[in-house]
Amino acid sequence: MESEPDQSFKDLSWFLQAIKDPQQTFFNLQTLSFSSSGNTTHCQLITESSMNINVTRDNLTSLSQIFIELATSLETQTSLRNLEFEGIFWEIELLQSLGLLLDNTSKIKQLAFRKNRFSEQCLNELSEILKRNRFLKEVMFLESSIGYRGATLLGSALQVNDSLEELQIWEDSIGSKGAEELSRMIEMNSSLKLFSIFDSSPFTATPLISAVLGMNREMEVHMWSGDHKRDRSLKLVEFLPESKTLRIYQIDISGSCRVAAALGMNTTVRSLDMTGAKLNSRWAKEFRWVLEQNKTLREVKLSKTGLKDKAVVYIAAGLFKNKSLQSLYVDGNRFGSVGVEDLLCPLSRFSALQLQANITLRSIVFGGSNTKIGRDGLTAVLKMVTTNETVVHLGIHDDASLGPDDFIHIFKSLQKNASLRRFSLQGCKGVRGDRVLEAITETLQINPLIEEIDLARTPLQDSGKADEIYQKLGHNGRKIDEAETDDSLKDMPLTEPKSVRAFLCGQNYAGKTTLCNSILQSSSASGFPYVENVRNLMNPVEQVVKTVGGMKIKTFKDEETKISMWNLAGQHEFFALHDLMFPSPCFFLIVLSLFRKPSNKEPKTPAEVEEELEYWLRFIVSNSRKAIQQCMKPNVTIVLTHSEKINLQSESFQATVGCIQRLRDKFQALVEFYPTVFTVDARSSPSVSKLTHHIRMTSKAILQRVPRVYQLCNDIVQLLSDWRSENSNKPIMRWKAFADLCQFKVPSLRIKSRNENIQIVETRRHAIATCLHQMGEVIYFDDLGFLILDYEWFCGEVLTQLIKLDVRKQSTGERNGFVSRKELEKTLRSSLQSPIPGMTSKVLEHFDACDLVKMMKKVELCYEQDPSSPDSSLLVPSILEEGRGKTQKWQINTHDCVYSGRHLQCDDSSHMFLTAGFFPRLQVHLHNRIMELKNQHGATYSLEKYLIAITIHGINIRVELGGQLGNYIDVLACSSKSLTETLRLIHQLIIPAIQSSCRGVILLEHIIRPQCVQDLTPPRFRQSQFVSLHRLKEALSSVPAETMYDYQHTWDSVLDSGKTVLRAGFDLARNLLSDDDFREVLQRRYHDLHNLAQELQVPTDENPEADNHVPVTNELEKVDPSFGGIAKGVEAVLQRLKIIEQEIRDLKQEIQGLRYYEHRLLIQLHHKVNYLVNYNVQMDERKVPNMFYFIRAENYGRRLITSMVPGMVALRIHMLCEFRREMHVVEDQLGCDVMQIDNQAVKCLAPYMTNFMKLVTFALRIGANWAAGMGHMIPDLSHTIAHLANPAVMTGAAGAAGAIGVAAALGRNRGRDRDIQEQEQRAAQQWLIDYLREQTCSTGRDIAEKFGLWRVRYRDDGSIAWICKRHMITRAHEVIQVPL
């Protein structure tokens, strides 16, 4: 136990003597504070490292003597680091003596002035001191009224000083002039790392943050405004260089324009958040330039900023040229359909051949009650959803202008989208009705790529129908962070929450409890309004004997904000509890001890610290992934304890710092780190004072960013506290008591008459209780009938004991992990009894044992063997044992069994994992889902610690947890049914249950080698024996249609100590994929070909007979033979074989239909080519070839030119051999140089280039031979066949209108008749004739030399063509040479 610090008062002479005496070894001062108050002069040792010296107002000269003595005795005071001054009225002589002290020491790093007063002469002297000092790192002024003049002098000093790293000016008024002076300092000073200011004027923020951004300073900035005396404060600006995040909470229009101008060439900001700031088109015009010039911005949030149509037009124009922005949030604004159209234009394509203008934006959110999307806006949304290839997250929030039919159209369009993963429709009033539900369900069946649909606060969710959608997506039904809303809740006002949680994460012996106590003590000593005592339900005797290990919660208040410190237990057996404790709003303190145990002096190695920190970061990310998608990244601060025992300059500590920095870089995209790593002595309140200040500021910032709550919740929190005080601190509140409290104390939740709709009031009460649950004030579930008011009691005593239950020691009737309800209740009573003889149990005093069982079932800690029986046995996963040593085999294993497996792996296992609580929860959750099935009779379900074994409908399934820290799940199946039926069961039952239990961690699906499944190969040997499902489908999409059914995937061999465990082999794709997967691949190929056919205007209805092969039929789904119960004999088996054979024939028929469709399109292609070659035989008697193209030399190769731009130089023109049905690129063709392309050339050639590139694209897609020489000249075909016939380019217009121009031009092309097309072809031909004449290449001989082509006439029809020498020889009997 640490001894109490000496609190006795000493006189000043004692202190002067002590600093002169080198024998005073106990005197190890780090912080020395000076104050001027009272009538006595004295000194007081606060802790072993901090002291306060108080002098009376008329005895300030004694401070000069102290400064001089300190200056001359520095060799004995090497530990002094900080000087603090409170209430000092400075005179010039006193300040000069302080300057003497600072000039004679390099040890003092911090100066703090609180409520000091300086004359102008003193400010000048202080400025001179700072100019010549090279050792100070931090200077802080608090309520010291330095004003404009002081800011000017500080700025001039810091223009010279290059060592100061932190400057803080709190609760002062430097004014805009002072801010301008400090901004000039920022332009000159590159060493300042932290700048904080709290000023009465909000206009001080603009010049300061503009200077930081304009000069690309890596400086952390915090700016506040308000009047602290009236408790009014507002954060204006925050810049965190560590996360490269700039947040602007409030700013005037001129200031916002100035900041935008500074952002243009900035390289330090990656995320810009201006949510709630008022902006207009003047700002947007400046911001357009930012989007066009800035290369580092990745995220922009402009929610609720009042933007109108004109402003959004500027932003959209910037998106056309932007190549870096990934996320844009413009919800809650006031623009209409015009704004929506412009906003989505750069993200849309108006032809399959047009290049999407912006391909970097991945997430876009718009909408709001004042955003009127309208008909035109809906059209733009449909076009974007249908054609966009890059957006992953689309959000339309709080919309009231679209109806159910509109959303049905949107979901229908989503069926064709291959990029969108998350679609958010929060608060949209038109998302209602069964037809919308059917549209969503149909879309999810057709498009399997959609991972999340957010229907929070929509009528569809309010009616309870959204649960079906969430289950299909693999989510946990209704979102946890959204309160239920309906018509009865509309008039309930919302407000910011007033409570926040700080989770202290760390292993045992990290010092979390000691640190928590010091934070509370520091907060109390800092003059905060008041501090709540720790919630305490036990008498002092019980506190002494209480076992360590539960969760501790301590609370204090900062103004109106309640901050709860949640001390998570460090022991491994409690990790499963942590999954239940992550609501919003919250942030995390990861506490790491630099020593293995506090009782010894053995420090941890950097690798040990790194391993521990990485675990907790992965743990936080794994549990916060869903929160990332909905709100914000988890906020994490790193704290190193026991730092007083080590040398912070040692190589070992610096190596530890390097390890921490590597992890921060690794997790930067998923976690919002506070840039400072705190090193503290957890026992010392002064040592944690900065950490305490950080906790206060972080809490306020987080509460401004999280979703709002019902205003009534903040009022009811106090009523619940009063109720507990009046009821002997009961931790449990029955629902009847809560209803009575609402009836008597809350008028808006009161039933006023018998004629009133009681159900509406009850709905409101339940909504308030649910909101309190989400805020972390209570624990409440609808069907349990009570509220838990004390988190610490429930988590620290009740759940902790439940997790640690060992029923095996007390149960005599255990059967396969099951225990009877009576035995479990008996065990609960004995485990929860008080350890003090004669004292009643504090748990069972408020909780009945049956309530505990209900709670365990609710949080999926156990399940009932027979839910229909009130005395059913229960299974508690904590009593399960591992199955090591047991023989692993399938229950059925015949020669006709089908073996299949799926490997579900974390998509980012380096940043997240399946937490320890996942698999026990999955064991219960999957059992409950199976029991809910209507046709589950006869199913068996057995468990081991890391295994779930299921038999249902004749299919045996094993679900295995694998990998270090649970990186993957293997689902293995042995079935007497077909592969398709087996995989349908896995995808409809097993995988959704797994996804809904893993807290939003994304799992990627792979196919396990069937031989590994059949032999139950140990997991360590099958790590290389799986292939990505997506990759296999892509491979099938790339092979010719006739080879799809026989496509093979090869497997590598597996060796163990030189011994072959698995031989190399292969499996046919049809034995790895279900018929559903095959049909999906076929549908996508049909879809791609259909789109290309439409672009070529190829008719698809000329051959009605072919249509019989094209559609994918669903006749097989009507075959549903029953395999339950006893087999019905040989006839049933033969019938089943016939069905399987029919499935194979149908699948082969569909593949044959695909190939036939490709053949039809190839014939149409030849017709199109022949038209282009011979569009007018009489035109100058074909004096020059028709089919020409341009290339450019690039990296020792050739690149096909797909678009013409005025001013292009160094091109080369080539021509194709035009022999019918065998057109090709001529090898070794010299070609002819084109020095420059002018505007006239572009106008003539653009329509020709459009038609030519369409044919090239289509030919390459269906494998036409004539395009074989083109493919290698088009590195990325899908993105380069664009800019065709771009009118904006031809007329020199701005690129911002390019996308609209292309859409209009290509739309006109489809409507032109043959005469117009001939005019376009004639213009291109005439340009070629004129050009060749200029190059003196107009004769047949010249063309043969340059292009290797000869003019011939076909013998059969007399048409003219230009063909190569090879065709001249091999097809001489078909042509006659016709020289010019």
UniProtKB/Swiss-Prot annotation:
Reported phenotype of the disruption mutant: Severe dwarfism combined with twisted and malformed organs, and sterility. Loss of initial meristematic divisions in the epidermal/lateral root cap. Defection in basipetal transport of auxin (IAA) leading to several development aberrations.
Tissues expressing this chain: Expressed in seedlings, roots, leaves, stems and flowers. Present in ovules, prominently in nucellus and integuments.
Highest taxon, organism lineage: Eukaryota
UniProt entry tagged with the keyword rRNA processing: no
TM stretches of this protein: 574-594, 1255-1275, 1287-1307
Residue sites binding GTP per the record: 506-513, 567-571, 641-644
Topology versus the membrane: Multi-pass membrane protein
Keywords noted in UniProt: Auxin signaling pathway, Developmental protein, GTP-binding, Hydrolase, Leucine-rich repeat, Membrane, Nucleotide-binding, Repeat, Transmembrane, Transmembrane helix
Residues in Roc domain copies: 493-702
Protein's GO biological process: auxin polar transport; auxin-activated signaling pathway; basipetal auxin transport; leaf morphogenesis; leaf vascular tissue pattern formation; meristem structural organization; multidimensional cell growth; radial pattern formation
Subcellular location: Membrane
Record's GO cellular component terms: membrane
Database matches in InterPro entries: COR-A, Leu-rich_rpt, LRR_dom_sf, P-loop_NTPase
Statement: the UniProt record of this protein carries the keyword Electron transport: no
First-listed, main subcellular location of the protein, grouped into a coarse class: membrane
Alphabetical list of Pfam families matching this protein: COR-A, COR-B, LRR_6
Domain COR: 757-931
Listed GO MF terms: GTP binding; hydrolase activity
LRR repeats: 26-46, 47-70, 105-132, 161-184, 266-289, 299-322, 323-346, 348-371, 446-472, 476-502, 640-665, 688-712, 799-826, 1023-1046, 1131-1154, 1229-1254
Protein role: Involved in the basipetal transport of auxin (IAA) that modulates growth and organs organization. Required for initial divisions in the epidermal/lateral root cap leading to the formation of epidermal cells and a clone of lateral root cap cells, as well as for the maintenance of the radial pattern of cell specification in the root, thus regulating the distinction between the lateral root cap and epidermis.
Full protein name: Protein TORNADO 1
Organism (species): Arabidopsis thaliana
